Structure formats: C-alpha cells, structure tokens
Amino acid sequence: MGVNIRHNKDRKVWRKEPKSQDIYLRLLVKLYRFLARRTNSTFNQVVLKRLFLSRTNWPPLSLSRMIRKMKLPGQENKTPVVVGTITDDVRVQEVPKLKVCALHVTSRACSRILKAGGKILTFDQLALDSPKGRGTGLLSGPRKGREVYRHFGKAPRTPHSHTKPYVRSKGRKFERARGRWASRGYKN
C-alpha cells in the first residue's frame, strides 16, 4: 500500500501583491515596486513588503509610542514612517514638532501634529522627498496588541497559564464555581 503524503505544508506562502483591491494602495505598490527595483535601498523593499500585509498586521501606532521612539538616541530629526494608522493618545500633553509619514492619520492625531507645527506626508510625497529612505525611521504598532492574543497560549486553568478563557458570559453561573479556579476554594 502507498503512503498518503500530506502536501498542505509543502509551500511557504508569502504575498507578492496586496489582497486588497484598493486602487490607491495598488498605486503605492506600483511606485514602491519601481523604487525597490531601481534603488539599492532596503527601506523601499521593506515598505513594499509591508504594503502587501493583511490589515491585522497593520496595527495602529499611538502618538505616545511614536514620540517615545523618536526620542531615542540617533532618532532625532528623523521622519517616522508608518505603514498603517497613527492614532491619538489623550495621555500625551505636549506633542513635539514632527514630520511624519503614514497611510492614514486619525483626525484628532492629525490636528495635534499640525498644531505643534509638524507636517504629515503621504507615501508618494515621501518618495519624492527621500527616494532612498534617508533620514527616516520605520515604525509599526504592536502586532500582539489585539484582544484575541490574550486567548492564545497555554490552556486556561492549567498551572502558570495566564491565558484568557472563552466564556459565554461573565455572570454568576459561568465558570465561577468552587473547584473551577484555584482562587475559588480549590482547583479540580
């Protein structure tokens, strides 16, 4: 008898183009595909690769995180580049003067950056401004910041597991009994 060979894991899948049919995104892909081919800069290759990613891999970047990253030694006077969204953070009192480049900036973050005397560039403007990515710093938001990641990992209710269980409701009758959790009397 023959052996059934599973071919489902044979191929490593990576994107060669974005799944999205958004024409503006596809125009950016055309531009950065040209730049990645014609320049010897890895910056353009990384931007192109990030433009292909799925939306869950384009996590939003908060204003506070961006400011913190741009204060690091060697990052002063650089343009933060975000393939994704920049969102506002109410915990930040003062926004420094920043020149930023992103696919999308929320209205409140936009007004705060501009009010501080900053500037917001689109990726086509960045390509004219700095075709090789000189004087830029690539940033991205936390990919594991989504709530769903709290449910991943070691099974809930096992020792040393901090994984969040999927519970239908947070009511009195749902997984709150003695013997269910170590904190409820004992754990069976």
Swiss-Prot record:
Any single GO BP term: translation
MF (Gene Ontology): RNA binding; structural constituent of ribosome
GO CC terms in record: cytosolic large ribosomal subunit; rough endoplasmic reticulum
Region of interest (Disordered), ranges: 150-188
Residues spanning the signal sequence: none
Record keywords: Cytoplasm, Endoplasmic reticulum, Isopeptide bond, Phosphoprotein, Ribonucleoprotein, Ribosomal protein, Ubl conjugation
InterPro entries: Ribosomal_eL18 (IPR000039), Ribosomal_uL15/eL18 (IPR021131), Ribosomal_uL15/eL18_sf (IPR036227)
UniProt entry tagged with the keyword Ribonucleoprotein: yes
Subcellular location per the Swiss-Prot or TrEMBL entry: Cytoplasm, Cytosol; Cytoplasm; Rough endoplasmic reticulum
Phosphothreonine sites (modified residues): T158
Pfam families registered for this protein in UniProt: Ribosomal_L18 (PF17135)
Modified residues (Phosphoserine): S130
Crosslink site: Glycyl lysine isopeptide (Lys-Gly) (interchain with G-Cter in SUMO2): K119, K164
Composition bias, Basic residues: 151-171, 179-188
Keyword set includes Repeat: no
Domain of life: Eukaryota
Primary site of residence: cytoplasm
Protein's job: Component of the large ribosomal subunit. The ribosome is a large ribonucleoprotein complex responsible for the synthesis of proteins in the cell.
Family: Belongs to the eukaryotic ribosomal protein eL18 family.
Record's subunit section: Component of the large ribosomal subunit.
Protein's name according to its UniProt entry: Large ribosomal subunit protein eL18
Organism of provenance: Oryctolagus cuniculus (Rabbit)
Lineage of origin: Eukaryota, Metazoa, Chordata, Craniata, Vertebrata
